[in-house]
Swiss-Prot record:
Protein name as it appears in the record: Dynamin-1-like protein
Top-level taxon in the UniProt lineage: Eukaryota
Region described as Important for homodimerization: 654-668
Positions of the UniProt region annotated as Disordered: 523-590
Outcome recorded upon mutating C446A: No effect on S-nitrosylation
Amino acid sequence: MEALIPVINKLQDVFNTVGADIIQLPQIVVVGTQSSGKSSVLESLVGRDLLPRGTGIVTRRPLILQLVHVSQEDKRKTTGEENGVEAEEWGKFLHTKNKLYTDFDEIRQEIENETERISGNNKGVSPEPIHLKIFSPNVVNLTLVDLPGMTKVPVGDQPKDIELQIRELILRFISNPNSIILAVTAANTDMATSEALKISREVDPDGRRTLAVITKLDLMDAGTDAMDVLMGRVIPVKLGIIGVVNRSQLDINNKKSVTDSIRDEYAFLQKKYPSLANRNGTKYLARTLNRLLMHHIRDCLPELKTRINVLAAQYQSLLNSYGEPVDDKSATLLQLITKFATEYCNTIEGTAKYIETSELCGGARICYIFHETFGRTLESVDPLGGLNTIDILTAIRNATGPRPALFVPEVSFELLVKRQIKRLEEPSLRCVELVHEEMQRIIQHCSNYSTQELLRFPKLHDAIVEVVTCLLRKRLPVTNEMVHNLVAIELAYINTKHPDFADACGLMNNNIEEQRRNRLARELPSAVSRDKSSKVPSALAPASQEPSPAASAEADGKLIQDSRRETKNVASGGGGVGDGVQEPTTGNWRGMLKTSKAEELLAEEKSKPIPIMPASPQKGHAVNLLDVPVPVARKLSAREQRDCEVIERLIKSYFLIVRKNIQDSVPKAVMHFLVNHVKDTLQSELVGQLYKSSLLDDLLTESEDMAQRRKEAADMLKALQGASQIIAEIRETHLW
């Protein structure tokens, strides 16, 4: 047991440097009602008169008292400074820094002064603790907490809810699972009414860390004793019940020493409780508390060891990120540049050490831009967006010039499809911009997660960011130009012989043929019946032949009628061809879109002159040929509908081919001219711009507080390693 005292003391000192909030050691918390003898028990354990005593409420602030065992031979006690003190026992307050107290009357007075400074001088209570450490060869290594006694009625400056405030204060200390509760109860009160045991059971229902102390054994009524209570027959306590005899107020007034009090206590126990004398008393209480503390520490060692290891790993990682002081600046600069370039490329490739889990980044995000954002944007572009029937008809008529069109002009198709292809340029350039932005974000990602060493050198970090940003900025116009050229290439030559386009035209031809057959099935019988009704016995030719010029000249009013029909056709926008004539619409696609024989027969039938009576003067109207034709809302003729349908299908077919090409070629161009180029030239660009002897000192200048943070991390790591070593020593002792 004695061998463990210096080890436990070292452990306590080490964790005092770490901080009690980081690692909480087991401590003894004294609770009880007001004037039950809590402070007297503490004084007996310390062996000195150091706590304020009196009637009523005396302890008005929590007192954290740490007892530190020192050897008898060590007469000169120092604090690590030049000044020391020649004494066997001394105390030190946390709020007075390094000031030492050898007179325990001064310690008691300082406690009173510090209490009044915070709590006032009229029985006020404060939750702010007083920290006191006592060094003595007469104590074992214990940490004790003296708390204000529980009360019911407020007095002096105490608030109305003083009972609730003190209760919450006590619960805050005893709720710590690493604490041992010392429940103090006066022997001259009923054990069943003990407030200390009641509040202890609230946080420790199993009684695994509660020790009962019975005070004032010498003040019981004549003829009674505490034998049943001390034996645990009234209320059993798992850790035991220990009786003690405190000094009375008369003994204190007479300056009776603690040593004399302990001697008289032993004599009293031998006389009144001879069978229990060796298991009661202040000395036995001290040994029991020490044993409980040791076992409690043993139970907490695994958790303490784990927490120390976690903290040590954190501070080791932090210290590594701070790095060692730079000796070879040239090698350090080259190493940092190379590491950044490698991490940047690895982030793009997806092999980086630190992989983001909350969102896509690096190469994965670039892939998403190519195949999701850019792909969906292109697919959302309507092949016929911005075109209507009037636009198509106008383009067809403008492409024919002054000549009537026999076929749909190919130039009208090219004009319209180029207009649609041009719409693919804007989303393509936007794709380049998104990839450029993502490569900018990769710079920050590498700085924050991958190469934390750069945080040591803020100027180097800024310089690297500037060089990479400039490199990306230089590649942006080149990439945009290439993407622009890809669209321009598609606009430069409309390849109507493209295999996919020919296949589409073949499918379209089959569809149109089917529609024509359906239309012919409806119109051919009516044309034949009309031909039979218009025959003259011997004057007209067969219906299958065209009328001769002589026959046309003989028809009454034919010239006037033809002129009127032409005029009417021009005014109605028929393109110089009669509405009823079904002309082939192949233009330069004759081999793709063919006219059936049946349709040619129907065209011949419709081209035959139909005798018409001379126009009535009252129904005629004048036509001004100098007027500019204006669009007229009307129903499209069959030919116009067919021409628009053909152009729309051809535009859609060719647009889909071009869109597929753009969707495939733009990501390739971006990868070659931007992404891969930056990957290949990044390190050489960084070395060329930054690896210069004139820039070494400036770039490798650490931030002002880096040295201080490195020292603090090293000190904390050393303290944690010392604590880990002490725990290992405790485990190796025979006690465990």
